[in-house]
């Protein structure tokens, strides 16, 4: 699991009763604020989040069978530096560097070496290569790749094919990661796992990147949803999704370092009802298996034809998504997308609806994610000591504001240090994280109302009652590493928040 570092040093803490944007205060009577020392976490450069997006493009965009050229190849050192300046420490080249459109290693080098050298000069923890020759093998395969009447007669034959493919780029300076694939269906998992393990054999030093479907009711990907007698369709769908993830892990050898998924929450109107349940399921599995959790998050405005699917995000939306991800223990975050995906089918990405325009000019979304990346890396020395344990959601009956998106989680988790939570309007998400080394609990308490619905701007008050042994909480607002302490009165903490705001509290 995550590397943990804890030391007791003198830090600046203050006893606060209010904070701009997120107000926290104790209620009633209690002990003096000076009687207990708050837990203290120090900066450590070895603790950090993983951030990435799709790389700057070659200026060629292919959408729905049509191709157009922006007039400039953006695979330059200047553009890679601008990408890194967001806070991205992993470079996902996707289809900007390709091996499927060349006939020789020499042609591959002629097309791509300059771009790869520029990326290497900037410096990234990982530079991820995709190989659409291998992706094509996976996309056409159901069942496994190895055996009688299969594509490869034995494991050695598969390894030889993979070795031939990766020989184009394996020894290029800076290239140290391979994109195994994206969103394999249930019937492709055996082949997906075989390729994953083959890469591990023929290129053992490579970081292997992969991504799974995020979303629950997807019969095309997972198979038919067939409820048992007395079981709801929703519960059957969640069970099938869990089976999909467990099967993927088994097919990949049973010991993988992380799960990665995408499930973009902010649809044209409202929040997707599968977002929190998907996070809950994956965070639970990561907890069981001792894995990290990575997530692609929403940074694009996307249409299907003329129909808006995912809305353009604002600063509050980005904060809403970030708090929700950190609350579930996510330690790697990718932005979908950077300028736009350079190869789409059936999807249209609005120019200016992502971090960059088609011409790679910055938008305000670039600034939002630059702020979030810096904030999270500063907070890493605190939150990356904690692992996800469980969650609950809360909503007001007959709310005039839609709260349906919080109702799909199990809500069976019992908090270690909280005895009661109440809200005065809307909906809230509370997640529990735990530091096994210090035995500290952390709670992420978030106003989960959609930030863009009518009437959502008013403050929501959440009252949290902690168990009797706790007299104080250490508070971090919106993942900002500027802690302050609050003395609990009658063991209660009142929090005023607008949508998307969250506090991370450690009771002591």
Kindly give the residue locations of the regions a language model identified.
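Aromatic-lined carbohydrate-recognition surfaces of secreted/lumenal glycan-active proteins
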Residues: 54, 129-131, 196-242, 288-304, ...
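Boundary/entry segment of secreted carbohydrate-active catalytic domains
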Residues: 34-94, 132-133
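C-terminal beta-strand-rich structural cap/linker in extracellular carbohydrate-active enzymes
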Residues: 487-508
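Aromatic/acidic polysaccharide-binding cleft in carbohydrate-active enzymes
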Residues: 316-374, 387-397
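Carbohydrate-binding surface patches
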Residues: 397-469
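Active-site groove signature of glycoside hydrolases
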Residues: 160-191, 214, 244-268
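Catalytic domains of carbohydrate-active enzymes, especially glycoside hydrolases
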Residues: 66-102, 111-127, 252-259
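Active-site clefts of carbohydrate-active enzymes
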Residues: 136-139, 219-220, 282-316, 351, ...
């Amino acid at each position: 699991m995550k590397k943990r570092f804890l030391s007791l040093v003198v830090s600046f803490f203050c006893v606060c009763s209010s904070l701009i944007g997120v107000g926290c205060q104790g209620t009633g009577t209690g002990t003096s604020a000076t009687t207990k020392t708050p837990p203290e976490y120090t900066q450590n450069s070895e603790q950090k989040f993983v951030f990435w997006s799709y790389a700057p493009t070659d200026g060629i965009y292919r959408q729905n069978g049509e191709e157009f050229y922006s007039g400039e190849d953006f695979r330059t050192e200047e553009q890679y530096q601008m990408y890194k300046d967001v806070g991205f420490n992993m470079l996902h080249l996707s289809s900007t560097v390709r091996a499927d459109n060349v006939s020789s290693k020499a042609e591959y080098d002629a097309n791509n070496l300059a771009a790869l050298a520029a990326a290497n000069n900037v410096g990234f923890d990982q530079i991820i290569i995709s190989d659409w020759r291998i992706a094509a093998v996976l996309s056409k395969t159901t069942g496994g790749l190895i055996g009688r009447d299969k594509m490869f007669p034995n494991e050695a034959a598969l390894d030889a094919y993979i070795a031939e493919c990766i020989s184009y780029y394996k020894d290029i300076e800076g290239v140290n990661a391979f994109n195994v694939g994206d969103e394999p269906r249930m019937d492709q998992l055996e082949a997906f796992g075989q390729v994953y393990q083959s890469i591990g054999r023929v290129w053992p030093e490579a970081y292997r990147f992969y991504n799974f479907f995020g979303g629950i009711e997807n019969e095309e990907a997972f198979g038919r949803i067939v409820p048992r007698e007395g079981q709801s369709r929703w519960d059957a769908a969640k069970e099938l999704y869990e089976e999909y993830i467990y099967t993927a892990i088994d097919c990949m050898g049973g010991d993988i370092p992380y799960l990665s998924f995408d499930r973009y929450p902010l649809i044209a109107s409202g929040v997707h009802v599968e977002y929190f349940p998907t996070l809950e399921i994956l965070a639970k599995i990561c907890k069981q298996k001792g894995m990290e959790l990575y997530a692609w998050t929403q940074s694009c405005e996307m249409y299907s034809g003329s129909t808006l699917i995912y809305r353009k995000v604002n600063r509050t939306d980005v904060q809403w998504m970030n708090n929700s991800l950190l609350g579930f223990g996510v330690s790697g975050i990718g932005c979908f997308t950077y300028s736009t995906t350079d190869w789409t089918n059936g999807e249209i990405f609005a120019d200016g609806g992502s971090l960059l325009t088609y011409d790679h000019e910055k938008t305000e979304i670039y600034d939002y994610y630059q702020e979030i990346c810096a904030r999270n890396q500063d907070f890493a020395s605190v939150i990356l000591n904690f692992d996800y344990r469980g969650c609950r959601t809360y909503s007001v009956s007959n709310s005039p504001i839609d709260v349906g998106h919080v109702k799909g989680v199990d809500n069976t988790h019992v908090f270690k240090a909280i005895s009661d939570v109440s809200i005065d309007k809307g909906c809230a998400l509370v997640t529990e994280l735990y530091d096994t080394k210090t035995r500290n609990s952390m709670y992420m308490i978030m106003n989960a109302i959609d930030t863009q619905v009518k009437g959502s701007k008013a403050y929501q008050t959440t009252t949290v009652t902690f168990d009797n042994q706790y007299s104080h909480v250490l508070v971090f607002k919106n993942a900002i590493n500027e802690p302050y302490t609050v003395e609990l009165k009658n063991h209660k903490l009142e929090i005023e928040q607008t949508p998307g705001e969250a506090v991370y509290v450690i009771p002591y």
